[in-house]
A protein has these predicted regions:
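Membrane-interface helix/loop caps of multi-pass membrane proteins
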Residues: 1-173
């Protein structure tokens, strides 16, 4: 089901990210935040509908849907990037290339780049070819934990506690 208003928000978010990377304006992170809000809204709704209908969440079905939707394209891009960068990057950077692609492949690149203090504002040299995977890593980590949080809150107090829990998490973050 495609909701036109959400599609418009996605387009706006993508535009913010593109104009940021084109160095037209700052604030591209707002586009990423919009993508996160959209994902959170859609996934929460999906999980709550399943809970109301069945009384549980099929984690297997949930994660299989995420895998089918995200991994083929993500891994294809990583593969093409790895092959291309192997030939285009200096040989002195190949160990970092392998490390960065491996971290992106298991969706922990946000932690790796934070550890090495690599971000878009702090790049003195050639940036990691997969630096953009930090946002996918955050989203995948959300997908890992969110169903458990929603299930726990729903079973303890229904939609009302879910709403309060989301509000509390929002304030704390």
């Amino acid at each position: 089901m495609r909701i036109p208003q959400i599609q418009a928000l996605r387009a706006f978010a993508a535009l913010l990210v593109v104009i940021y990377h084109a160095k037209i304006t700052s604030g591209g992170y707002i586009g990423v935040d919009i993508f996160y809000v959209i994902s959170g809204y859609l996934i929460t709704g999906l999980l709550l509908r399943e809970l109301e209908k069945t009384g549980t969440i099929s984690l297997r079905a949930f994660y299989l849907r995420r895998v089918k939707r995200l991994l083929p394209t993500s891994f294809f891009v990583l593969f093409v990037t790895a092959i291309s960068a192997w030939y285009l990057y200096p040989s002195t950077m190949r160990s970092e290339l392998g490390r960065d692609i491996a971290a992106a492949g298991v969706y922990i690149s946000n932690y790796l780049f934070a550890f090495w203090q690599m971000d878009y504002q702090n790049l003195n040299a050639m940036p990691p070819v997969v630096i953009h995977y930090w946002s996918l890593a955050v989203e995948e980590q959300f997908y890992i934990f969110w169903p458990f949080i929603i299930y726990f809150l729903y079973k303890r107090g229904g939609k009302r506690l879910v709403g309060r829990g989301i509000a509390a998490i929002s304030v704390l973050s």
